Amino acid sequence: WLEINNHDINKILTDKIENLRNLQGKIDLVAGGPPCQGFSLAGKRDTKDQRNKLVKAYIKFIEIVQPRALIFENVHGFTVKFKGNKGSIKEYSNYVIEKLTELGYRVDSRIVDVSEFSVPQKRRRFILVAMKDHNPSDVFEALERNKQNFCEQKGLNPKTTIFEAISDLQKNHGTCQSPDTKHFQAGLYGQIESGYQKLMRQNVENQTVAVDSHRFVNHSETIIKLHNDLLNNAPRGKRITPKDNLV
């Protein structure tokens, strides 16, 4: 009754409500969450952002379907209070926890840094697990307990730097005419220099041709100058903002 496609959750809650009710107690796991843009600390964090209201639609969906377990993911900003006209507004994370608890779920949540699993970026995410019949804390304990084993099985270091991740994609390894875009140069693979690169390339059959979707931009002189100014003047390890007057 539901096509495999993108759907508006509000429309599903309206048009397919009876179908959802028929699923009650039959679903093992619901995984997902609302869009992250409205909660991100890098964004505007507008209290009127309509996307943030999808949290309530999510709770309504869970209330109707009553899955045995659910996994909810969002940015770290989901746990940070919004500032409204009348002071701070409750963290959305606490709202979700309270509502799920009211629905009879046992709930646990953590901030997980995926860089600890050899992902080459410091990406902190709010992860929530809720269960009807089991302790959700067991999931996070298993995640922590198996971190080292996970990396070892994949042949990865506990931490992966950007250089270790993409040094084999540098332009100095060679270029060729892009096979799918005229007037652009594509990059060629360099030698594998890390466990991460070996893992990422394990299913690449022909590693002597152009890297898939790896085209070099044809920058104008103005953009090249801007990039050079940024490289020469921007402080390291700091986010660039308009206040820096570099753009």
For each of these PLM feature ranges, what is it?
Residues P34, N74, S109-I111, K154:
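A cross-domain feature marking catalytic cores of carbohydrate-active enzymes
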Residues Q37-L41, F78-K81, S118-K122, N135-V139:
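Short catalytic/ligand-binding loop motif for oxyanion handling, primarily in non-cytosolic enzymes
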Residues Q66-R68, Y105, R124:
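A short helix->loop->beta-strand "cap" motif at the edges of active sites that frequently abuts
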Residues H76, Y105-E116:
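Conserved S-adenosyl-L-methionine
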